[in-house]
Amino acid sequence: MSTHDPISDLITRIRNAQMRSKPKVSTPGSKMRANVLEVLKSEGYIRGYASVEHSSGRSELEIELKYFDGEPVIREIERVSRPGRRVYASVKNLPRVNNGLGISVLSTPKGIMADHEARDANVGGEVLFTVF
């Protein structure tokens, strides 16, 4: 099944799996999703992910979710820029999530990265979603 917004699909799968306290969740594989998951892993919001190849030739990403004292590490995950309403921010206007306790994930000319990495690299871009 094709989705029109793969980032929203990924966010929804993670949110739903954490509400049910699932240890893992899978999603169709793509480079963009893998890059987003790499940012979430480096920031400590997920344990990890692995690419799984099926005999039919399609790949899936198996995401290992992270919990602390039985509660999901991700308290809120919210889509900001959508296909119908793109949200861009310059390096000066990058949003701070909960006074710096959360992160914004951006798509920049230098790749997908967290907001603090974008500030360090002095680049702006499309604000994909926020995590707290």
Curated annotation (Swiss-Prot):
A cellular component term, taken from the record's GO annotations: ribonucleoprotein complex
Cross-referenced PROSITE patterns: RIBOSOMAL_S8
MF terms (GO), sorted A to Z: rRNA binding; structural constituent of ribosome
Keywords of this entry: Ribonucleoprotein, Ribosomal protein, RNA-binding, rRNA-binding
PANTHER family for the chain: 40S RIBOSOMAL PROTEIN S15A
Primary role: One of the primary rRNA binding proteins, it binds directly to 16S rRNA central domain where it helps coordinate assembly of the platform of the 30S subunit.
NCBIfam families: PRK00136.1
Protein name listed in UniProt: Small ribosomal subunit protein uS8
Organismal lineage: Bacteria, Pseudomonadati, Pseudomonadota, Alphaproteobacteria, Hyphomicrobiales
